[in-house]
Amino acid sequence: MVYAFIRNAAILAYKIWYGISFEGVENLPEEGTFIIACNHRSYADPVLLSLKVKRRCTYMAKEELFKNPVFSALIRAFGAFPVQRGQGDNGIIDIAVGKLKSGKNLAIFPEGTRSKDGTVGRGKTGVALIAARAGVPVVPCGIAYEGKLHFRNKITVRYGKPISPEQLKISDNPAPRELKELKNTIMSSITELVER
């Protein structure tokens, strides 16, 4: 209930402040868990990509973001969970897969950091490994900003068609080459959505 209230208030605020629009909402699965893989340009991205997702998403966020109690409460309301840097890839992957297997959707930014100039980076293979181990579809998402984040600058959030586990054609213990190919497929889809 708190999540729904915050989400609806955020939609209204973003529409007034930025003129936000959404495309491809019909591509979000109605049932089952899934991963949303999105480009990363702004601290607002986790909120933006989840505004049209009916079921709450979870997010990985660096532990430092949870030090401020007010900000911590806000990002936890949107499903963020802390990840300790240096925890090791396997530990982070296990947590993410556990969230998906417990029935929660996962939003992830494969680039691993924000893009300063808006170009979509190469991404990392973690998103591919999580998808492979959890056996869930990946919904590519592109957030396109018109210029910088200033009042009334347009933001468009685009959701692409889900990439199903069958389309991924990957084992649950994939080789590095398989992971790289899958990551490239996901990143190409994201780039296409951003540049459309």
Where are these predicted regions, by residue range?
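Short amphipathic alpha-helix with an adjacent loop that forms part of the alpha/beta core around
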Residues: 26-29, 97-98
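A generic structural signal for alpha->beta connector loops
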Residues: 19, 54-56, 77, 103, ...
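Short gly/ser/thr-rich secondary-structure transition/capping motifs
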Residues: 15-23, 87, 141
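Short, flexible active-site-adjacent loop segments at beta-strand->alpha-helix junctions, enriched
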Residues: 26, 40-41, 48, 63, ...
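Structural motif corresponding to alpha-helix initiation and N-cap regions
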Residues: 22-25, 68, 90-93
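N-terminal membrane-anchoring alpha-helices
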Residues: 1-19
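Non-catalytic C-terminal accessory region of glycerolipid acyltransferases
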Residues: 91-196
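Catalytic core of membrane glycerolipid acyltransferases/transacylases, capturing the structured
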Residues: 6, 15, 28-87
